[in-house]
Amino acid sequence: MKRILKTWTPVVSLAALVAAPAALAGYKTESAYCYKNTDNSGGCYGSLLGFRNHSGSNTYAYFTQYYSGSKYFNAAYTSGTTTTYFSCTPNAATAVQWPKAMNHQGYFTVYWDASGACYSLYLNNGSQYSNF
């Protein structure tokens, strides 16, 4: 019996290692993208780390809140040699999330309508978005 266990132990161990999920230690997600429709509605998504490390030298994104209470999202996205600028002001429902967006280090998606009102803000956090 001991001989059989000794024979099968390496096989079972190898099978367990192969079946184990990957830990993804050190994995980082860096993405950045913005678009604008013909009616000036549009959206941006990615992470602030992704915008900072984007290959376009003029690419950036930030959430702002002034002392007066005014809130804005501003971004620039460079594709090739063309930089396009984006901005929106949150509506009442989206403005509630602004304090979270100000400290957010993960993935975000923000959409705005043709009048420039941010009507949707999606925030997703995870270790793969942080630069530790």
Locate each region found by the language model.
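Short nucleic-acid-contacting surface segments enriched for D/E, G, S/T with interspersed K/R
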Residues: T94-T109
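OB-fold/S1-family single-stranded nucleic acid-binding modules
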Residues: S115-F132
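Bacterial N-terminal signal peptides that target proteins for export
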Residues: K2-V11
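N-terminal, post-signal-peptide region of Sec/Tat-exported proteins
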Residues: L48-T78
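N-terminal signal peptide c-region/cleavage motif recognized by signal peptidases
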Residues: A20-P21
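Short N-terminal segments immediately surrounding and downstream of signal-peptide cleavage
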Residues: Y27-G42
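Beta-strand/loop nucleic-acid-binding surfaces
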Residues: T84-Q97
